[in-house]
Curated annotation (Swiss-Prot):
One of its GO terms (molecular function) is structural constituent of ribosome. Belongs to the universal ribosomal protein uL11 family. One or more lysine residues are methylated. The gene is rplK. Forms part of the ribosomal stalk which helps the ribosome interact with GTP-bound translation factors. NCBIfam families: L11_bact. InterPro entries: Ribosomal_uL11, Ribosomal_uL11_bac-typ, Ribosomal_uL11_C, Ribosomal_uL11_C_sf, Ribosomal_uL11_N, Ribosomal_uL11_N_sf. This is Large ribosomal subunit protein uL11. One of its GO terms (cellular component) is cytosolic large ribosomal subunit. Part of the ribosomal stalk of the 50S ribosomal subunit. Interacts with L10 and the large rRNA to form the base of the stalk. L10 forms an elongated spine to which L12 dimers bind in a sequential fashion forming a multimeric L10(L12)X complex. One of its GO terms (biological process) is translation. Keywords: Methylation, Ribonucleoprotein, Ribosomal protein, RNA-binding, rRNA-binding.
Length: 140
């Protein structure tokens, strides 16, 4: 029989940089999970993308064991990385912070495809373009 699930924890942690300080420590501590064990496992799994924000869903079981699934980085993080900018525009309709080519959008959409609710690469590209526009990035 499968283990009884007591909860899910969703966090966004920089890859390879999980440590027991907040927000990770308190979130895992209240479910009775071994915090250092999670940090070591997460850092080992994500060391290839060092520093990139990585969403993780942790499943906590009744015996205080856990499993976790890492997702692809948020689209906004991938867009900022592609353009080399620190943040999006505070007024996206007026101030543009950069230009993203269709090829860059396609590359980001392909990377995000497993986590997007899109049937094809074209619809995934439209989702990424919408995120980029809301950040004040032009699509060329």
């Amino acid at each position: 029989m499968a283990k009884k699930i007591t909860g899910y924890i969703k966090l966004q942690i920089p890859a390879g940089k999980a440590n027991p300080s907040p927000p990770i420590g308190p979130a895992l501590g209240q479910h009775g999970v071994n915090i250092m064990e999670f940090c070591k496992a997460f850092n080992a799994k994500t060391q290839a993308e060092e520093g990139t924000i990585t969403p993780v869903v942790i499943t906590v079981f009744a015996d205080r064991s856990f499993s976790f699934i890492t997702k692809t980085p948020p689209a906004s993080v991938l867009i900022k990385k592609a353009l080399g900018i620190e943040s999006g525009s505070s007024v996206p309709n007026k101030n543009k912070v950069g230009k993203l080519t269709k090829d860059q959008v396609k590359e980001i959409a392909a990377k995000k495809m497993p986590d997007l609710n899109a049937a094809s690469l074209e619809t995934a590209m439209k989702t990424i373009e919408g995120t980029a526009r809301s950040m004040g990035v032009e699509i060329v």
